[in-house]
Amino acid sequence: MAKTKQNSSFIAVLAMIFLIGMISFVTNLAAPIGNILKMQPQIAGSNALGMMGNMMNFLAYAIMGIPAGNMLTKYGYKRTALIAIAVGFIGVFVQFLSGVVGSFPANFIVYLLGAFISGFSVCMLNTVVNPMLKLLGGKRSNQYIQIGGSFNSLMGTLTPMLVGALIGTLTAQSKIADVNPVLFIAMGVFALAFIILLFVPIEDPDQVKTTEKVESPLKFRHFVYGVIAIFLYVGVEVGIPGTLNFYLSDSVKGAGLDPSVAVRTAGFVAGTYWLLMLVGRLVSSFISGKVSSKTQLTCVSMVAIILVIWAMFSPVSTQTSMPAFTGSGFEMVKVPLSALLLVLCGLCTSVMWGTIFDLAVEGLGAATNKASGIFMAMVVGGGILPLLQNFIADKAGYMPSYWVIVAGLAFILFFAVAGSKVKKA
């Protein structure tokens, strides 16, 4: 009996790890699918409208960030996870329907609805998967969480690559149905995870209730700065590769790549950014015991600012080679140097969430749980900043739009250097 329970728990752990990967998988569908939407004649190449799916995905965090935490208390870990998985399946299915419902604007509206529903799922999954792994994993829970984080980064790497390969050459005839295999994979993983968790017995941990009044974390000035920093960070993290994907895919106003390979190249280059985030997290895990969060955040913020400004002022004619899938195989392809510089920012952004969180909750005590819910709501920055950036890209060009990223990084640097000092507002 004990062995059967252990095997069931291990299967549930695997399901949770796959769901951590699905968080990144579903989130990173938005930018490459945005390339397809941009080609709709009615959208006329608008980067801002192409980024609307990403916006809807992250908008859900502002609505669901704090309630998702309350669901854990009200419904328990298992029921919350099952609800999140079911909502995720529905969200991806609605996105699939957008490829078959007809022409613009109906297909566009249905797609945005699907992205919004998926955002609710991803928000709930972000809230429940790590506590579930901690509960199911026992003494090995931290190891499982680290494996899940690595799988999350791997999915972030593969998603734009896979979507880019499926789209092939971007034309006015490109449609969301071109990426149906990716949507089928997502629905399959959600369905399998739901079935597994449905039949695995999971007991919720005992909740320690307290009558002690918990002070609002917003009374701490450094936490307020940290909330702003998290909002900007998620926007920076998403905006750098998302806009880079648009830039490389755009053969006319962007990087000037061969149209027959531009989208595939863009997917692989953007995917490399997420791969470097994985590398950065691994490096950070080794040095975090010796290098403080303040020092790490200060250094990576400064380096990221230098890389982005360098990329902005690097001529398109200055090129370098990066590996990419061209349709017939993997090759070294020529891309603007700016693309490589922006990809390297993945090493910098990889450690920002953890270090900002660590500095922002310093000295909060019992208010830390409330702080976590506020942070989850601030993930909406991943939708707002990229939308603003691509609105500017439509008006002034791709590279000038990265001033939005520089501004965000500048505030994060301020937070690391001065704003993180523990002090009540």
Role assignments for model-derived ranges:
Residues 11-43, 130, 240-248:
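Extracytoplasmic
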Residues 30-31, 159, 219-275:
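Extracytoplasmic gate region of multi-pass secondary transporters
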Residues 51-72, 271-283, 381:
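Central cavity-lining transmembrane alpha-helices of secondary-active solute carriers
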Residues 63-109:
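Conserved MFS/SLC helix-loop-helix module at the cytosolic interface between two early adjacent transmembrane helices
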Residues 86-105, 302-331:
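C-terminal ends and interior cores of transmembrane alpha-helices
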Residues 105-125, 323-352:
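Hydrophobic core of transmembrane alpha-helices in multi-pass small-molecule transporters
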Residues 124-138, 349-365:
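Intracellular juxtamembrane helix-capping segments at the cytosolic ends
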Residues 139-140, 144-202:
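Helix-loop-helix hairpin linking two adjacent transmembrane segments in secondary transporters
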